[in-house]
Structure formats: C-alpha cells, structure tokens
Amino acid sequence: MENKRVLDGVGVLSVLVIALLVVACQGNVLGYKGELVEEKNQVPLKSGGPHSEVWNTRNIILSYDYTNEADRLDISGEVALAGGAENFQYVEHLDVNLYFVDGNGRIIKQEPLFSAVTNDMGKNWTFQRKIEKPAAAESMAFGYSGQVQSVGSDQDRFDFWETPI
C-alpha cells in the first residue's frame, strides 16, 4: 500500500515538473508576440517599392531592399558581422528575425529572416525571402542572436543578441 502512495506521489510530481517546463518554455514557443516595440526600433512599412534600408547594430549590419505588397513582403539583402563579432574566425550560429508590428506598436508576427549554419566561416551572407504579411502590419522590426568562436586551443566564444523590445 505504501509503495503505491509513493508511486502516486512521484506521478503527481512528474506531472507538475512537466507542466512547469511547458510554461517555462512557452516564451520561446510564442516568441515576442504581443510585446511592445519601442518606436525607435520600428521601421514603417512604405507601400510599393523597392525601398532600401540599413539596420546598424553593435554586432551586425543588415542592408536590405523590400517591396511591400498588400499581403506579402518581399525582402532581400545582406547580413554582415560588425563590432566584436567580426573579430572571431567562425560563426557557431546566427539567427536574424523579422517582426511585424501593428499600429499600436505590438508584435503581431515573427518570421525567421536568416540563419547561418554551425562552423560557417563567412562574415557576410545574402538572403531573399517572400513573407506572408499580416493585414494589420504597419511597421517591422528586427532582432538577432548569435555565437562566434575563435580557433585554436582557447576557442573563445562570444554570444551576442538584440531584440526590438
């Protein structure tokens, strides 16, 4: 009888741990949807195009052209490492995201824009995407996360990121 109660307790504890993990990971699953983007981080979506823009940050430079259509955003350009990130020999990972923002400054959709693969030796990459655009999108914003690494016995690593919120 006592063994059964212990097992029931372990079962309940397991369910609680799993529930907590699901809640904790929900931020990664949902991304930044609903979060407020500062006005300085918003790029108003001009109609038509192509329009040329540059987004300079501490660690990357995103140079891009976009054409804004009613239900789609065509965007292409180049991602280049900058600042401290460009001093490392290779990229462990680099992910750049595009965020559609509504008229209230809230993120309504997140789209992956570009990803560099593990051990990529590049410093500049090109991308081209056709992205379904939400009807309520009035501006866009960008964010990234990455890790670069040196070669040799030290193999120093440098993590870098920026979000629009």
Language model features with spans:
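Short, solvent-exposed, Trp/other aromatic-anchored flexible loops in extracytoplasmic proteins
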Residues: 106-152
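Short amphipathic, basic-aromatic surface patches that mediate peripheral association
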Residues: 78-88
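Bacterial Sec signal peptide processing site at the extreme N-terminus
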Residues: 22-42
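Conserved aromatic beta-strand anchor motif in extracellular beta-sandwich/beta-rich domains
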Residues: 96-102
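Low-complexity, acidic Ser/Thr/Pro/Gly-rich terminal tails and inter-domain linkers that flank the onset
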Residues: 39-70, 78-80
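Surface-exposed edge beta-strand/loop patches
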Residues: 36-46, 132-134, 138-165
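Sec-dependent bacterial lipoprotein signal peptides
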Residues: 1-25
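Short coil-to-beta strand junction motifs in C2/discoidin
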Residues: 89-96
